């Protein structure tokens, strides 16, 4: 597969396909023409010795300091080196790769004044899978993701660390190995690389992909639990959900009916009891609301993936050109979206933990043994798996605190409101990792409960899932180190998203 970039039409589905295949990036000719035109504007500014922020002046509080024309390129190199203040663990390889794609895509809109050499260097790094090592901490989310993107830029100029073919190396060594020159930044290009929201947006894209997948995975896991508790099928009838008219809720109900079709373990209203608890009866309403959040997040991310979020921005109208200092680098729209994503994923974990509690609690699980123990008393069974799930969902409640309302002033009060969008992105991904483990715990417990109930009664679709996951997690016939089972299932759930990941 080839991913064609034009600065206008990039989607999350394209990104997902790119990550699943050994894809290459190609650039549409019209986009390259826009790059050339915007660069010509920068060259005219230099030739005419105009005063334009970030091209002929310093940055931030130093925006009124005029730079000597002989030092324009040095200014850009200094910018990258001084702003590379990222700290902590690096972003994943997937996030770093998507970050480069997004930065390239925004340059192709033709409002940043980048050279074709910069564009081609980014394309080269992407296609050769030279992955910059980019620390996660250090961004305020306005003026964009300065610190993370500076580490990306360091790799392009041969001064950063990269992962190449599974090894951590100096980018200069990799470029030499591939007979490629480090990029020599020209006027405006350092700013064009780091003024933007690509760190938070790239992490947001990966988080969205994994969150959506968790939403679908949670349905078949819930269907296993539903059958193990002889859940009532009537609550999923189409007419119940059609009268509320939330499409995502309607869709979840339809998928739950599909997962449960043919089961002899489900029951009808008043057959055993009149109503189920909310965590079974309200799966379409709860999960559907999470999908509503995911759809909003996707919309915001795709707007930003195709946005010009540099500063200043270069425009051409008729025969006139002008350069405007604005604030498109401010990450507030993405910060809000990613804070919402945290809520949607946290609720999937919350309701999963409550379902698995019903499977192990002898007061709630019908005729199943306490904690599904093979020998109650001597064997503890799934007792502490529920503890672990409770710990994770409680941690998520702390992580779900909105980062986007926690502004702090910076740059001598010039940058006096920031988005903290990258913090929202980082915390959001930790919530996803936690939620995946909670669902893995529910899966391990639901597999055992279904076995005790009699797998011959499972619906055909959930029976296939049972057989698939029993190859990973054996029956609980005695107490063992269940953390190994939980991590094995969590990893398997994640690998189903990135079956053949392009950056590995």
Swiss-Prot record:
Compartment(s) of residence: Cytoplasm
PANTHER family assigned: HISTIDINE AMMONIA-LYASE
Keyword Membrane: no
Endpoints of the signal sequence: none
Known EC number: 4.3.1.3
Gene3D superfamilies: Fumarase/aspartase (Central domain), Fumarase/aspartase (N-terminal domain)
GO molecular function, one term: histidine ammonia-lyase activity
Entry comment on modification after translation: Contains an active site 4-methylidene-imidazol-5-one (MIO), which is formed autocatalytically by cyclization and dehydration of residues Ala-Ser-Gly.
Name the UniProt record assigns to this protein: Histidine ammonia-lyase
S-S pairs: none
NCBIfam families documented for this protein: hutH, PRK09367.1
GO BP field: L-histidine catabolic process to glutamate and formamide; L-histidine catabolic process to glutamate and formate
HAMAP family tied to this protein: His_ammonia_lyase
Pathway of action: Amino-acid degradation; L-histidine degradation into L-glutamate; N-formimidoyl-L-glutamate from L-histidine: step 1/3
GO cellular component, one term: cytoplasm
Family: Belongs to the PAL/histidase family.
Residue list for modification 2,3-didehydroalanine (Ser): 143
Keyword Phosphoprotein in annotation: no
PROSITE patterns: PAL_HISTIDASE (PS00488)
Cross-referenced Pfam families: Lyase_aromatic
Organism: Staphylococcus aureus (strain MRSA252)
């Amino acid at each position: 597969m080839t991913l064609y970039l034009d600065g206008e039409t990039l989607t999350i589905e394209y990104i997902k396909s790119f990550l699943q295949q050994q894809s290459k990036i190609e650039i549409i000719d019209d986009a390259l023409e826009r790059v050339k035109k915007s660069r010509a504007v920068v060259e005219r500014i230099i030739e005419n010795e105009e005063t334009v922020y970030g091209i002929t002046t310093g940055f931030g509080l130093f925006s009124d300091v005029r730079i000597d024309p002989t030092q324009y390129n040095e200014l850009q190199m200094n910018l990258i080196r001084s702003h590379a203040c990222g700290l902590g663990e690096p972003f994943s390889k997937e996030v770093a790769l998507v970050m480069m794609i997004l930065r390239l895509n925004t340059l192709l809109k033709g409002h940043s004044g980048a050279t074709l050499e910069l564009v081609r260097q980014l394309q080269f790094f992407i296609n050769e899978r030279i992955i910059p090592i980019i620390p996660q901490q250090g961004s305020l989310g306005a003026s964009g993701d300065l610190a993370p993107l500076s580490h990306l830029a360091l790799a392009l100029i041969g001064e950063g660390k990269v992962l190449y073919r599974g090894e951590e190396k100096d980018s200069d060594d990799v470029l030499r190995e591939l007979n490629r020159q480090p990029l020599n930044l020209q006027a405006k290009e350092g700013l064009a690389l780091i003024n933007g929201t690509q760190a938070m947006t790239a992490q947001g894209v990966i988080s969205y992909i994994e969150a959506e997948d968790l939403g679908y995975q949670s349905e078949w896991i819930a269907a296993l639990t539903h059958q193990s508790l002889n859940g009532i099928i009537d609550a999923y009838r189409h007419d119940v959900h059609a009268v509320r008219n939330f499409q995502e809720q309607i869709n979840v109900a339809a998928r739950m009916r599909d997962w449960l079709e043919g089961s002899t373990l489900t029951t009808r209203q008043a057959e055993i009891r009149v109503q189920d608890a909310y965590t079974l009866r309200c799966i379409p309403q709860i999960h559907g609301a999470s999908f509503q959040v995911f759809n909003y997040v996707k919309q915001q991310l795709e707007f930003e993936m195709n946005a010009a979020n540099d500063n200043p921005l270069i425009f051409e109208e008729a025969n006139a050109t002008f350069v405007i200092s604005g604030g498109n680098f401010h990450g507030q729209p993405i910060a809000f979206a990613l804070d919402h994503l945290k809520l949607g994923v946290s609720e999937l974990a919350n309701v999963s933990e409550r379902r698995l509690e019903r499977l192990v609690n002898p007061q709630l699980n019908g005729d199943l043994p306490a904690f599904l123990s093979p020998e109650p008393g001597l064997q503890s069974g799934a007792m502490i798996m529920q503890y672990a799930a409770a710990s994770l969902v409680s941690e998520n409640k702390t992580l779900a605190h909105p980062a986007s309302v926690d502004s702090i002033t910076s740059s001598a009060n010039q940058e006096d409101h920031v988005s903290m969008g990258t913090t929202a992105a980082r915390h959001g991904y930790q919530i996803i990792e936690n939620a995946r483990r909670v669902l893995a715990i529910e899966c391990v417990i639901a597999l055992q409960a279904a076995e005790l109930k009699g797998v011959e009664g499972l619906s055909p679709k959930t029976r296939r899932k049972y057989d698939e996951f029993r190859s990973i997690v054996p029956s609980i016939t005695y107490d063992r180190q269940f953390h190994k089972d939980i991590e094995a299932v969590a990893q398997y759930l994640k690998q189903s998203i990135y079956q053949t990941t392009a950056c590995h």
